[in-house]
Amino acid sequence: MSSASSSSAASLLLGREVDVFLSFCCQTSHGYFQNILIRNGIRTFLSYRCLEKRFGPIGQRTLKALEESRVAVVMTSTTKPCSVGFLEELLVILEFQEKGSLMVIPIFLTDLSFNVEEICRQHPEKAPSWRTALTKLTNLAAEYPLSQNLAGMDQSDLLNQIARDISLVVFYSGSNDSNALVAMDRHMKVVYDLLALEVNKEVRTIGIWGSAGVGKTTLARYIYAEIFVNFQTHVFLDNVENMKDKLLKFEGEEDPTVIISSYHDGHEITEARRKHRKILLIADDVNNMEQGKWIIEYANWFAPGSRVILISQNKNLLVDAGVMDVYEVRSLRYDEALQVFSHFAFKQPYPPSDFEELAVRAVHLAGFLPLGLRLLGSFLAGKGREEWVAALLKLKAKQGGHIMEVWKLMEATDDKGLEEWETAADIVERKESSQDKSQQESEVAADILIGKESSQDKQ
């Protein structure tokens, strides 16, 4: 594979959904507010269009972030003039809002007005559309209860409150989707028992494990949204790489702004240790023994009643790291998988009778994995029987033994069509042929393709 192809594949695999799009008319408070959201486990995209004083198209990266976001926060201040970049971006944000794909939350740092007189005089041809957009933004402040007028109030406290409210919107908007809710009650009942939230005499640590794409992170984020209000500090770590070195460095760092800019969650975690606070810490994607052991050792310094959850594909890693209990997130049961697939393929809980046999084949092809069920169901939605038969045969032949990597690559493509699916499969095939397969990769592939179906029989 060429270096360009390798880079493209890597970027696709690393692509992540954005929860909240941040658009500020000035740089005031934007870094502080972004850090609050990140500490609440919210994935953000911070736009710097406010710095642009000339006209220019919205970049593809910015557009993609808007398409993926559930919420856009637009922060304004009368003490700072609105820039061309901010106003042009606002027009695009409101287009997404009018289509119903984006919730817009205005935050007024001073009062319900805007510093735009000078820029409107400079660009009279754009002034009408800009003023209309700003009027819509003002109206949204009354329409949405999360919007706040911060004039004369303590901005720090209110920004923290808004961040907490946004976290509920983000987490629960996903939970209201039948795809997210399926099997969640079953998982949560066991996890609640393991967490034993009523016990405040110790720091409890649990591990959540399972194959790639089975829904470990979805479950962890659901847990986070359900219980974070019970803790003084709460942190959801998407990336624990080099966590030990970074936190040890932050322990001796006197300037908290350096801590936050270097590692968004480092300050919260070290403060919880220093001040013996009750913390909820969830660490996703723990993939080596040193990471797990060090997190468990570090957690001993938190206040009694704290809860630490480690997420990994490797059960032995979690046990050897020293977690008290482990829970396996298995692939969906047959009826659950069929319900998730039908939601995306037919917009109803179960398939029509004339598509039932094909739907069952598709569920097996997706490996009972939520990610695969969503992508394959969305792709087949609206197609006729002949198209289903042809697509399922072609996908089964093309899929080979690396279903999870193909699903991840497919998830990152804008158009979930068969051509893009085949391209993703080709990338994985070339990647595998250009390197030796490690024992771990073979085990993961076998678990996904074979073990999943056998696990269904055992449940």
UniProtKB/Swiss-Prot annotation:
Task: Please name the SMART domains in this protein's record.
Answer: AAA (SM00382)
Q: Where in the cell is it found?
A: Cytoplasm
Q: In which tissues is it expressed?
A: Mostly expressed in leaves, stems and roots, and, to a lower extent, in flowers and siliques.
In alphabetical order, the GO MF annotations are:
ADP binding; ATP hydrolysis activity; NAD+ nucleosidase activity, cyclic ADP-ribose generating
- Where is the NB-ARC domain positioned along the sequence? 191-401
In this protein, the active site sits at: E89
Q: Which keywords accompany this UniProt record?
A: Cytoplasm, Hydrolase, NAD
Which InterPro entries does this UniProt record tie to the protein? Answer: AAA+_ATPase, Apaf_helical, Disease_R_plants, NB-ARC, P-loop_NTPase, TIR_dom, Toll_tir_struct_dom_sf
Residues annotated as signal peptide: none
A single GO BP annotation from the record? defense response
Catalytic activities:
NAD(+) + H2O = ADP-D-ribose + nicotinamide + H(+)
Residue ranges annotated as compositionally biased, kind Basic and acidic residues, are 429-440
- Top-rank EC class of the record's enzyme: hydrolase
Residue ranges of domain TIR in the record: 16-170
Region feature Disordered, mapped onto this chain: 429-459
| Taxonomic superkingdom | Eukaryota
This protein's GO CC annotations: cytoplasm
Q: Does the keyword Manganese apply?
A: no
The UniProt entry, under Gene3D superfamilies, shows: Helical domain of apoptotic protease-activating factors, P-loop containing nucleotide triphosphate hydrolases, Toll/interleukin-1 receptor homology (TIR) domain
Chief site of localization: cytoplasm
UniProt EC number? 3.2.2.6
* Protein role: Confers resistance to low temperatures by limiting chloroplast damage and cell death, thus maintaining growth homeostasis.
The domain comment in this protein's record states: The TIR domain mediates NAD(+) hydrolase (NADase) activity. Self-association of TIR domains is required for NADase activity.
Which PANTHER family does the entry mention? Answer: DISEASE RESISTANCE PROTEIN CHL1, LEUCINE-RICH REPEAT-CONTAINING PROTEIN
Q: This chain belongs to which protein, by name?
A: Disease resistance protein CHL1
Source organism:
Arabidopsis thaliana (Mouse-ear cress)
